[in-house]
A protein has these predicted regions:
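Short juxta-domain linker segments that transition from a proline/glycine-rich
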Residues: 1-171
Length: 171
């Protein structure tokens, strides 16, 4: 749809003046995952600036771009015409859980080498690359072994136990 194309163009415009350190450095990005995850607990003005710095260091121009009504988009990666790697996000519906999952999903695309294809993430897209990025995001937020242990041995309907578990996995 045209609204999606317009949002992508806005992303390109928002990131064109962001300086990055060369090409995408996936090893450095992978090493920054815990730092990125720890930003979940900061105020929005702190983590937006820190994310821009981290991504620029890893060779990616990062921006949070307001979403348009009718554009069911959460995140977007692209290698621009001038060769710059772009990662744009929305804060659609104001939900932190969606934002952080989608951010890690987009990082999964970057680490999986999916930059050769333009990826726009919205709910109707289903593919192997999307499934791999989803799995990466899930395991980055809550390691599967810990999740299975929690659901097997704890009362996952008990709010207190959920909070304790969330603290133990740093989410």
């Amino acid at each position: 749809p045209y609204v999606l194309f317009a949002w992508q163009k806005l992303c390109e415009k928002e990131t064109e003046n962001i300086s990055v350190n060369g090409e995408l450095n996936t090893e450095l990005l992978r090493s920054k995952l815990n730092t990125i995850k720890n930003l979940m607990f900061e105020k929005i003005d702190v983590w937006t600036e820190k994310l821009q710095e981290i991504f620029a260091e890893c060779g990616v121009a990062f921006a949070i771009v307001h979403n348009f009504k009718g554009a069911p988009v959460q995140g977007f990666i692209k290698k621009s015409e001038n060769g710059k790697n772009i990662l744009c996000m929305t804060i659609r519906n104001g939900r932190a859980d969606s934002f952080w999952f989608t951010l890690l999903h987009e990082i999964g695309h970057l680490l999986n080498g999916d930059l050769s294809t333009r990826f726009v993430d919205f709910s109707s897209v289903v593919s192997d690359a999307e499934a791999k990025a989803d799995e990466f995001a899930m395991n980055s937020l809550i390691p599967v072994e810990q999740y299975l242990k929690f659901t097997r041995f704890c009362d996952y309907h008990n709010e207190c136990e959920i909070h304790t578990f969330a603290q133990s996995v740093n989410v």
